[in-house]
């Protein structure tokens, strides 16, 4: 079993990407589609750094890449509105451009798992988006994909349909309002099989559990 972080030496690029569309997919959760040449340099599991179009906002916002369409040169990002900076991003519309820096993060190495093997994808909350493109590319190479995703409640559940298009999906909610009541650990601790590769993104507590659960495999 392999944990899959991909380290590479890359050149950081900055480009004004064009917003193709934006919509709210859950309360305070937005999905934005961006278009531009630098999409060709994006990899699964990475994120973009967006410059908020407001001179008072000096720091870029890191946003996970959810899907990549290399043919259309489009990338989908998903983010949660937390404070003023992301609130400004949520008001942007199709046709506007946004200063974008990529690639950011090591990403996931999908080369370590082969056709016919099993990959376990584990995500919590806003950590779920980068698993979507990961699942799509793994499925395309013949890997069996099993996803376990956890949320606070039914209203917070996102991207379940896109992950189901790639394989089996288990959904947990803290309050039991949707799917299985509990946490991702509730499901994973009941598995009687061992994955060949694990890809995970979420809160520190969840990642600590994943490290502990699979450290001896």
Labelled PLM ranges:
Residues 1-3, 53, 101:
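Selective for proline/serine-rich intrinsically disordered segments
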Residues 9-13, 200:
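Extended hydrophobic/aromatic-rich secondary-structure runs
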Residues 2-10:
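Short, Lys/Arg-enriched N-terminal segments with co-localized hydrophobic residues
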Residues 84-217:
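FNR/FR-type flavoprotein reductase catalytic core
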Residues 12-96:
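Ferredoxin-reductase
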């Amino acid at each position: 079993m392999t944990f899959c972080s991909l380290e590479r030496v890359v050149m950081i690029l900055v480009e004004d990407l064009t917003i193709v569309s934006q919509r709210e997919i859950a309360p305070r959760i937005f999905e934005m589609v961006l278009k531009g040449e630098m999409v060709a340099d994006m990899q699964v599991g990475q994120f973009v750094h967006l410059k908020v179009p407001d001179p008072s906002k000096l720091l870029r916002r890191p946003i996970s890449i959810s899907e990549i369409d290399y043919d259309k040169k489009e990338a989908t990002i998903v983010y949660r509105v937390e404070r003023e900076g992301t609130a400004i991003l949520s008001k942007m519309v199709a046709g506007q451009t946004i200063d974008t820096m990529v690639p950011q993060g090591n990403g996931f190495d999908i080369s370590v798992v082969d056709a016919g093997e099993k990959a376990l994808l584990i995500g919590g909350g806003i950590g779920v988006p980068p698993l979507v493109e990961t699942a799509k590319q793994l499925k395309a190479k013949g890997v069996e994909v099993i996803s376990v995703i956890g949320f606070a409640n039914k209203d917070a559940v996102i991207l379940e349909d896109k992950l189901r298009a790639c394989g089996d999906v288990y959904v947990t909610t803290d309050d039991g309002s949707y799917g299985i009541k509990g946490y991702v650990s509730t499901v994973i601790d009941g598995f009687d099989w061992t994955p060949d590769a694990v890809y995970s993104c979420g809160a520190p507590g969840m990642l600590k559990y994943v490290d502990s659960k699979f450290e001896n495999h």
